[in-house]
Structure formats: structure tokens, C-alpha cells
Amino acid sequence: MTAPLDVTELRKQFSIGRPAIDGVSFAVPAGEIVVLLGPSGCGKTTTLRCVAGLEHPTSGEISIAGRVVSSPARGILVPPRSRDLGMVFQSYAVWPHMTVRQNVVYPLKHRKITRADAARMVDEVLELVGLSEYADRPVVALS
């Protein structure tokens, strides 16, 4: 069975000199939470930006749910919005005029899912991170 996220021999070269990523491979099994940990400048953010489709790898392959979304050698490059993937940036800013629930559901509005399914998914995520009781509060009320 394929992993929901499979990265093989990923390489990203921005310019002359050392590559930002050189031969990174990993798989994230279903239900797992994985941390990319390392010193500043080691390629963590570049790796995630390649997975999300915000950077184009120089070589290697990225598959999401068994579907190849990036393979320069095969001429495959699926755009970010078509990857069925979300990303929270390191400097993520919330929408201050929205509630916690509205901030969480916002990215789902671009997906082809019903409002009921989106509401269910948001409730599950808020429960998972212990924020259910704050769902309808203004997001700026969180510290």
C-alpha cells in the first residue's frame, strides 16, 4: 500500500552552489504525524514548499495518496490547488474578524465538499487540538 505522502530523492537547486535539498526521501503513513527538524537553512521549508507545489523541485518525485504530483523527469507538475493538501505556514496569520471555526473552515471553501462535510471536518480538527470550546469565539481571543 502506498503512503499518503511519499517523497523520493527530492532535489531543489536555486542557483549555483549547494542545493537547498539534495536527495531527501521519506514517507508519511496514514494517521502519522511527522516533524521535520533541523537547523536554520537546512531545507525544511523548501521541502514542504515543494510538497505543497509552491516550489518546483529540480529532480525527484512526490506522490500524494498514490498520485504523482511532481516528477520533473516525467514532466509532471500538478498545481498547488489540485494537490488536495493544506499547509500552515510558519508565519501564519489568522483572519482577525473571524471566529476560530471560520478560520479553520476557510481553506475548505476551495474544495468540492458539502457544507455539512466541512462542518464535520472542522469539528473533528478542533476536537483533536483541544479547541472545541473556543470554536465560536473571535480568533483574536486566543493567546
Identify what each model region corresponds to.
Residues 37-39:
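The feature captures the beta-strand-to-loop junction immediately N-terminal to the Walker
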Residues 52:
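Helix-to-loop junction immediately C-terminal to a conserved catalytic motif
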Residues 138-142:
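Conserved ABC ATPase signature
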Residues 61-83, 113-114:
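ABC ATPase NBD Q-loop/coupling interface
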Residues 98-107:
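Short coil-to-helix segment of the ABC ATPase nucleotide-binding domain corresponding to the Q-loop/switch region
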Residues 24-35, 95:
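Pre-Walker A (P-loop) beta-loop-beta motif of ABC nucleotide-binding domains
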Residues 1-7, 12-23, 30, 73-77, ...:
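A short, flexible loop at the N-terminus of ABC-type nucleotide-binding domains that lies
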Residues 67-71, 109-134:
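Conserved ABC ATPase "signature" region
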